[in-house]
């Protein structure tokens, strides 16, 4: 796959946008998913979902990235002042400096190194826990949307824990969770018109984005497959148990 095309797919289907996109697409194919919300009230709800699960975490990532770059810049000059040679500093901090170079090319929301993912993932987990509390316990609509928020929150927490030890594709995880949720939803509501094609499109998107992550070199095959298995399992289980 062409790398520019792979980057476009990875950006459009960013993991933090998936919960909102999933609820929106399910509403379009089956409006009863957000009963008793209808029409304008649903879109007000959807905007809040995108804010809580997408916009706020993305802003947090940007702020963390800016702070991260500023910190390394100060560290660089501090080491030079302390008479550490430039060559020595670059050799010791090569992975981090490569990361900065990539981000200065416009990839502000990518985290190529496993160790630099842990703290942002932890903070995003906290935001998702708050979102889950808000949408499940304070402003619950029905058991289906509750299951979606619980599944996505559990996945973010699990990915954070796994990332301490191994790198895993969160793109593959969230999109395969969407596949699992879609399959599970179809089990309980099998009479929805054209639902087979809806699920087929989600499966195709999941496959395309997973391929894109491999094409970009962001993950290897094991990391993508691990994400696919984890996401699908949690998503399907959430819908079965809801």
Feature roles, as predicted:
Residues 75-85, 107-123:
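Juxtamembrane helix-capping/reentrant segments at transmembrane boundaries
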Residues 60-78, 96-111, 156-168, 207-219:
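C-terminal ends of transmembrane helices
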């Amino acid at each position: 796959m062409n790398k520019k095309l792979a980057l476009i797919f990875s950006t459009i289907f960013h993991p933090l946008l998936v919960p909102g996109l999933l609820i929106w697409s399910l509403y379009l194919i089956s409006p009863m998913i957000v009963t008793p919300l209808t029409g304008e009230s649903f879109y007000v709800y959807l905007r809040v979902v995108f804010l809580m699960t997408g916009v706020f975490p993305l802003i947090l990532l940007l702020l963390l990235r800016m702070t991260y770059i500023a910190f390394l810049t100060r560290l660089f000059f501090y080491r030079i002042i302390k008479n550490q040679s430039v060559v020595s500093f670059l050799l010791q901090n090569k992975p981090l400096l490569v990361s900065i170079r990539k981000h200065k090319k416009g990839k502000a929301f990518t985290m190529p190194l496993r160790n630099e993912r842990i703290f942002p993932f932890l903070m995003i987990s906290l935001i998702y826990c708050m979102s889950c509390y808000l949408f499940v316990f304070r402003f619950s609509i029905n058991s289906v949307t509750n299951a979606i928020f619980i599944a996505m929150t559990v996945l973010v927490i699990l990915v954070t824990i796994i990332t301490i030890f191994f790198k895993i594709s969160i793109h593959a995880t969230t999109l395969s969770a969407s596949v699992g949720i879609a399959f599970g939803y179809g089990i309980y509501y099998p009479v929805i018109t054209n639902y087979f094609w809806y699920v087929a499109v989600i499966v195709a998107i999941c496959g395309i984005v997973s391929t894109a992550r491999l094409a970009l070199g962001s993950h290897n095959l094991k990391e993508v497959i691990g994400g696919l298995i984890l996401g699908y399992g949690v998503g399907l289980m959430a819908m079965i148990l809801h």
